C-alpha cells in the first residue's frame, strides 16, 4: 500500500489533516470518495451477477445433457483421455565423434547442439571434423 493510502486509512492522521483543511474541501473529498465507493460496489455486483448467470447456464446445460442420457463425467473423461496421452521420449542419439579434451580425457559428441570447446579449438587449429569420426 502506498504512503498516501496508509495515511488515508489511519483515523488519527485523517483527524489531524481534517483540522487543517476547510470544511468545503473535506465535504468535496467525502463526495468524491463516496462516488468511488459506489462505483466499486456496482462493479462487484455486476461481476457477481455475471458469475451467477454463467453458473445458471452451466446448470441448465448439465440438465439438458442428463435428459439426453449424457453423463457430464463421461464427457470430461473422453477429453482428458485424448489430451493426457504420454509424450514419446526420443531415444538418445549414438555418439558420432570422439575427441580428447584439455585434461586428456576421451569424450564423445553426437554432432548435435553446440560443438564442445575442446573440439572447436582443435578444428580451429586446422583439423577436420572427419578426423574425429568414430
Swiss-Prot record:
Keywords for this protein: Coiled coil, Cytoplasm, DNA-binding, Plasmid, Repressor, Transcription, Transcription regulation
Does the record bear Transcription in its keywords? yes
Entries under InterPro entries matching the protein: H-NS-like_N (IPR054180), H-NS_C_dom (IPR027444), H-NS_C_dom_sf (IPR037150), Histone_HNS (IPR001801), Histone_HNS_N (IPR027454)
What family does the entry list?
A: Belongs to the histone-like protein H-NS family.
Q: How does it assemble?
A: Homodimer that oligomerizes on DNA into higher-order complexes that form bridges between disparate regions of DNA compacting it. Interacts with Hha, YdgT and StpA.
User: What additional remark is attached to this entry?
Assistant: This protein is encoded on incompatibility group H (IncHI) plasmid R27, a temperature-sensitive conjugative plasmid.
Record protein name field: DNA-binding protein H-NS, plasmid
Amino acid at each position: 500500500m502506498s504512503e498516501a493510502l496508509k495515511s488515508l486509512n489511519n483515523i488519527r492522521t485523517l483527524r489531524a489533516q481534517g483540522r487543517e483543511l476547510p470544511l468545503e474541501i473535506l465535504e468535496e473529498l467525502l463526495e468524491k470518495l463516496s462516488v468511488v465507493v459506489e462505483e466499486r460496489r456496482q462493479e462487484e455486483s455486476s461481476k457477481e451477477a455475471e458469475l451467477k448467470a454463467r453458473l445458471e447456464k452451466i446448470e441448465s446445460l448439465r440438465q439438458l445433457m442428463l435428459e439426453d442420457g449424457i453423463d457430464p463425467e463421461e464427457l470430461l473423461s473422453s477429453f482428458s483421455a485424448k489430451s493426457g496421452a504420454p509424450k514419446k521420449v526420443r531415444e538418445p542419439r549414438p555418439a558420432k565423434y570422439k575427441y580428447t579434451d584439455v585434461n586428456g580425457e576421451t569424450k564423445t559428441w553426437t554432432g548435435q547442439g553446440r560443438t564442445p570447446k575442446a573440439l572447436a579449438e582443435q578444428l580451429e587449429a586446422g583439423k577436420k571434423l572427419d578426423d574425429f569420426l568414430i
